[in-house]
Regions:
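Inter-lobe coupling/hinge segments of SF2-like helicase ATPases
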Residues: 1-226
Length: 226
């Protein structure tokens, strides 16, 4: 439910493959999103960026043989966390160091693949060095106090850009947010659950609802390769 008579945000779908072919993609951001971010920040407004994967990269892979690090207990790929250079299972909490070389073929080139909120935050710092950036996910929120501090800073406009996972969708009403970017809609749909499309739509609508909460005119950019 939106505040008063506020209009719903305008939604733009941006093709990541087409943007890359046109040279209109920087890091994990299409030019459309970056242009709208620059405009919003220039007006003194706030931006929220949604990427529903924690860590720096969802997995690491050997560029030679394709080996990936997997949890010995859950058999899921381990997420790479750049801080501490650790591989972490987000299901059971198993942690291990990044191997110096591929355990399978012994080649040293084991590289992070994909991107999570940690990488998004790092890239945003480089693209908008003057902006005040914060991250809201289970790694940055180590306590209720830490959670409250991040929310309070954003609400008081001491933060310009908030990067987060599903935690940023929880019904917050930030008056200063005029733009929401959904960085990778594909990973919401690429789920074996037969209700994946329905749940992806619900989640994207929740995220989109953070834009222009009070005075209308908000915008949402959904990046997808589909």
């Amino acid at each position: 439910e939106r505040y008063g008579d506020a209009r719903p945000p305008e939604i733009f779908v941006s093709d990541t493959i087409r943007a890359a072919k046109r040279g209109e993609r920087h890091a994990h951001f299409n030019k459309l999103l970056l242009d709208k971010m620059e405009a919003a920040l220039g007006r003194g407004e706030q931006v929220m960026l949604f990427q529903n994967r924690r860590g720096f990269a969802p997995y690491v892979e050997c560029s030679e043989c394709g080996w990936t690090a997997r949890c010995p207990h859950c058999n899921v790929t381990l997420t790479y966390h750049k801080g501490g250079r650790k591989l972490v299972c987000h299901y059971c909490g198993h942690t291990e160091d990044v191997p110096a070389k591929c355990p399978s073929c012994k080649v040293t080139d084991v590289v992070p693949m994909g991107f999570g909120t940690e990488k998004v935050e790092e890239e945003i710092f480089k693209i908008f060095p003057e902006a005040r950036v914060a991250r809201l996910d289970r790694d940055s929120v180590t306590s209720e106090k830490a959670f409250s501090a991040i929310i309070a800073d954003f609400e008081a406009r001491r933060t310009d850009i908030l990067v987060g996972t599903q935690m940023i969708t929880k019904g917050f009403d930030f008056a200063g947010v005029s733009l929401v970017g959904i960085l990778n809609a594909d990973n919401l749909l690429n789920n074996p659950d037969f209700r994946a499309a329905e749940r992806a739509f619900q989640l994207m609508m929740q995220v989109a609802g953070r834009a222009g909460r009070r005075d209308g005119g908000g915008e949402v950019v959904i990046q997808t390769s589909e």
